[in-house]
Swiss-Prot record:
Its EC number is 2.5.1.61. Gene3D superfamilies: Periplasmic binding protein-like II (3.40.190.10), Porphobilinogen deaminase, C-terminal domain (3.30.160.40). It comes from Sphingopyxis alaskensis (strain DSM 13593 / LMG 18877 / RB2256). Binds 1 dipyrromethane group covalently. PROSITE patterns: PORPHOBILINOGEN_DEAM. This is Porphobilinogen deaminase. The porphobilinogen subunits are added to the dipyrromethane group. Belongs to the HMBS family. The lineage of its organism: Bacteria, Pseudomonadati, Pseudomonadota, Alphaproteobacteria, Sphingomonadales. Tetrapolymerization of the monopyrrole PBG into the hydroxymethylbilane pre-uroporphyrinogen in several discrete steps. One of its GO terms (molecular function) is hydroxymethylbilane synthase activity. GO terms for biological process: protoporphyrinogen IX biosynthetic process. Pfam families: Porphobil_deam, Porphobil_deamC. Pathway: Porphyrin-containing compound metabolism; protoporphyrin-IX biosynthesis; coproporphyrinogen-III from 5-aminolevulinate: step 2/4.
Length: 315
C-alpha cells in the first residue's frame, strides 16, 4: 500500500469544484478504494475553483485557453499540496509540463454529444431544429460541425458548467445546445437530450475520458495509479491526443478526433478539421499501429486542407 494512502496520511485528490468535476473525483477515489482495499479515510478530495470556472462571459481563446482549467491544479500538484489531480482530459492541454505524469485513465464513458433543446422546441436531431434557431456553444468544433450541417442556424456563445448552460437554455439565451453525454450521465441526467451519432458529430479528442495526474518523480503514487488505469481507453485517447500534437491546434481550432476499438481488435482513429464557418473540412482515418501512422494522418489532413483551415493550426 502507498504510504500516503492511510487515514493518518491520506492521498489528497485535487479537482475542480464544479459538480461534474467533483463527481469525477469521487469516481477516481472509488476506483482507488476498490483496487487497493483502502479505507475511505485514506483519501481526501480537495476541490478548488479554476480560472475557467470564474470567467464565463467570454470564449476560452480570449482569456487563456485550456490552461484555465488546469492552472490551479497544476500549481497545487507542483507545490505538493495535493498528490494527484483528476481532469476531464478533453479540457487538458495536449502538451503537458514534464513535471506531471498521466498515471491513469478511467474507462471511457459515452464520447458522443447530446442535443438539448429549450421548452417549446421539438427536435431530436440537428436537422430537425427550426430554421434560424440559435444553438449555444463555446466549442469551435461543435460550432463548425453545426454550421456545416445547418448553415442557417445561428451559433451563439454559451459557457458555464452543465447546470449553468441548462439554466441559460431555459432562460432563452439559446434554443438548443450540445453537451457531452458522459458529463450528463455522471451527473445523473440520464434523460436529458438526444444522443447524436458520431457519423454526424465526431467527438472532441479525449471526450468522455477522465485522467489522473501525479508528479512525475512520485514513484509510489505512479504505482498506485497504475492499478486503476484502463489500458484500452489509455491507448485510444493517447492516439487522439497525439494527433492533436501533430496538428498543432489550440482551443480555437475546430478539430474532432475519435479512436474506437473495432470488433476485430484493431484501433481505428477518425479525424476531421474544419474552417471556422464549417464550409471547408477535411476528414480521414487510419488503423493505429504505431505513432508514425497517427503522425502521417495529421500531416495528410493539413496537406489537404485549404488556407481557411490551415490558418487555424500552428504548422
Amino acid at each position: 500500500m502507498n504510504e500516503l494512502a492511510t487515514p493518518d496520511n491520506p492521498l489528497r485528490i485535487g479537482t475542480r469544484a464544479s459538480p461534474l468535476a467533483m463527481a469525477q473525483a469521487h469516481m477516481a477515489a472509488a476506483a482507488l478504494i476498490a483496487a487497493h482495499g483502502l479505507a475511505m479515510a485514506a483519501l481526501e478530495i480537495v476541490p478548488m475553483t479554476a480560472t475557467g470556472d470564474r470567467i464565463q462571459d467570454r470564449a476560452l481563446a480570449e482569456v487563456g485557453g485550456k490552461a484555465l482549467w488546469t492552472r490551479e491544479l497544476d500549481a497545487a500538484l507542483d507545490a505538493g499540496t495535493i498528490d494527484v489531480a483528476v481532469h476531464s482530459l478533453k479540457d487538458v492541454e495536449t502538451l503537458r509540463d514534464a513535471r506531471f505524469f498521466l498515471g491513469a485513465m478511467l474507462e471511457r464513458a459515452d464520447p458522443r454529444d447530446r442535443l438539448v433543446v429549450r421548452e417549446g422546441i421539438a427536435a431530436q436531431k440537428i436537422s430537425e431544429l427550426p430554421h434560424g434557431a440559435r444553438l449555444g456553444t463555446s466549442s469551435p468544433r461543435r460550432a463548425a460541425q453545426v454550421r456545416r450541417l445547418r448553415p442557417d442556424l445561428d451559433t451563439v456563445l454559451l459557457r458555464g458548467n452543465v447546470a449553468t448552460r441548462l439554466a441559460k437554455l431555459a432562460a432563452g439565451e439559446a434554443d438548443a445546445t450540445l453537451l457531452a453525454a458522459a458529463g450528463l450521465e455522471r451527473l445523473g441526467m440520464h434523460d436529458i437530450g438526444a444522443v447524436q451519432g458520431t457519423e454526424l458529430l465526431l467527438p472532441a479528442a479525449s471526450q468522455g475520458a477522465i485522467g489522473i495526474e501525479c508528479r512525475a518523480d512520485d514513484a509510489a503514487t505512479i504505482a498506485l495509479l497504475a492499478a486503476i488505469d484502463h489500458a484500452p481507453t489509455h491507448r485510444a485517447v493517447a492516439a487522439e491526443r497525439a494527433l492533436l500534437a501533430v496538428l498543432g491546434g489550440d482551443c480555437r481550432s475546430p478539430v474532432a478526433a475519435y479512436a474506437e476499438w473495432q470488433a476485430d481488435g484493431v484501433l481505428r482513429l477518425d479525424a476531421e478539421i474544419f474552417s471556422e464557418d464549417g464550409a471547408d473540412h477535411v476528414a480521414g482515418h487510419v488503423i493505429v499501429t504505431d505513432a508514425g501512422v497517427v503522425a502521417a494522418l495529421g500531416h495528410r489532413l493539413l496537406a489537404e486542407a485549404p488556407p481557411s483551415i490551415r490558418r487555424l493550426f500552428a504548422t
